[in-house]
Amino acid sequence: MTNPITDLANSDCILVIGSNFAENHPIVARWVMDARQRGATLMVADPRYTATAWASDIFLPLMPGSDISLLNSIMHVIVKEKLYNRQFLEAHTTGFDDLCSAVENYPPGRAAKLTGVSEDKIARAARAYANAPASSIVYCMGVTQHVSGTQTVIACADLALLCGQVGRPGTGVNPLRGQDNVQGACDMGALPNVYPAYQSISDPANRSKFAAAWNIPVDTLSPNSGLTLVEMTHAIERNEMHGMLIMGENPIVGDPNSNRVRGSLEKIDFLAVIDIFMTETAQLADVILPAASFAERRGSKTTTDRRVQWLERAIQPIGESHPDWQIVCGLAGRLGLRDAFNYDTEDGILDEIRRVAPSYAGISAGRLQNTIGGIHWPCPTDDHPGTPILYTNGFNKVDGRGVMKPVEHIESAEPTSPEYPLVLTSGRVVLHYNSGSMTRRSPALLKREPEMFIQINPETAREYGLVTGGLAQVTTRRGSLQAVVRVSLRIPPGVLFMPYHFPTMNQLTIDALDPTARIPEYKVAACRIEPLGEKERAA
């Protein structure tokens, strides 16, 4: 996030796209509601009329995968009506003319056909965002989990730059991470193409720097990008990968095209899993290493708004469980790599982070333990207060200017067809979390949300002979599953919604990837649906 979560309370207009934070990030919702009570305009772009949309002033009910067309059309209106921030553009950006040429092709009339959002709502959203003194954009995985995800994020940044809505309180482009400490994991280099602090592995100077820090020969560090998890399962199929260590992940439930994932993990020569539960994935493992829960470990965590905080354990690890870092260091020692993993404490790990990650250089364990609310990176020195708001004095370019990059509408990987005429999209519900490894073990939560369901519009339900409480079968090119029907006006005709917290849902999703970020397209799959008779239900 360019701005802290708490700073959302200072916004005069908030455009939410691809996020249902009322259910999925309820703490974020608190600060947004503070802004609303102060008179801010809340606009929500989502295929479903979610709990977040319910609270909005302007609801933009777009079809799944049409986000770029909506954003480009909003910018079209802003350019046509000259609502952009000319002074900011001239002083702080490049690429304005190219952007204007691109968005010229997205008048509200055309965008309405591509997105399903009315011309009037597009124009109202554009004026509200551009005219507000401080406007913020908030997005989540409803934006990124598409083959067009990277391009959509660029469009969000273009919109913010166009109106000068960045670098000030209440403004910015603010992605919400999908789970606890994902920001911290990425900051630490848990990505296939960067070292900690997003330092590229292709840069020889970076490889030399980290080889020295880790006490290893520089030629052991590859300049080539590694694989994402989806790409790893494909590599197993090609016999290019023979062993895997999975930490705190349940890909058999959580990854797209999960039947294919299961086939790969059943085929691999060796599988080790580090987890606190016997997940569906752990059941396939050759070795299971019991991890400590959050209450049994200590160390730093980084939240979605770059806020680094210190966590102390509540109890000692139970049984044979250990914190993840101790397990990894133990494995490294057995593999003859002890010199590269010579950590004795969590504080010592953070000391190394400070040495190799410039954005963390001023963040010590001692400072965190004595700082209520944490410290926002970048924090380059011990006496630096941290940086809650980014880009207050320009951008990270040689000329200090933000670059506007026009993007075009990109079709989803799997369009509908006569055989698969409906669009399936997936997401979360308030009572469960990710693959359900934790929440499906809670009797109280299961009592309220016990099973998979299919949300469907009344018009589509009538067309296919479906009623609330009935059982239906949903089929895609990758598999079929049965679930209970919930007829609802909260979803548009032609679209089905299913939560992904249950073991079978991702049998249906497609593992097509965004070509840049290599994130799979969970949010769009072509499908069909049919009611099941009594005999089929009994079976």
Language model: regions and residue ranges:
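Glycine-rich oxoanion-binding loops at beta->alpha junctions
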Residues: M1-I14, S222-T233
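A short helix->loop->beta-strand "cap" motif at the edges of active sites that frequently abuts
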Residues: A35-T41, E266-F270
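Long, well-ordered, tryptophan-enriched scaffold segments
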Residues: G39-M43, R48-A132
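Flexible glycine/proline-rich, aromatic-decorated loop/lid segments
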Residues: R48-A51, I276-E312
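N-terminal leader/propeptide and maturation segments of large enzyme subunits in energy/redox metabolism
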Residues: L83-E119, P196-L221, I315-T387, L424, ...
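A glycine-rich, hydrophobic/aromatic-adjacent loop/helix-cap motif
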Residues: Y129-H234, D305, D339, P380-P385, ...
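Long, low-complexity segments enriched in small/aliphatic residues
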Residues: L176, Q183-P192, A213-W214, G348-A444
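Long, contiguous, secondary-structure-rich segments that constitute the structural scaffold
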Residues: I318-E320, D324-I372, S435, R440-Q455, ...
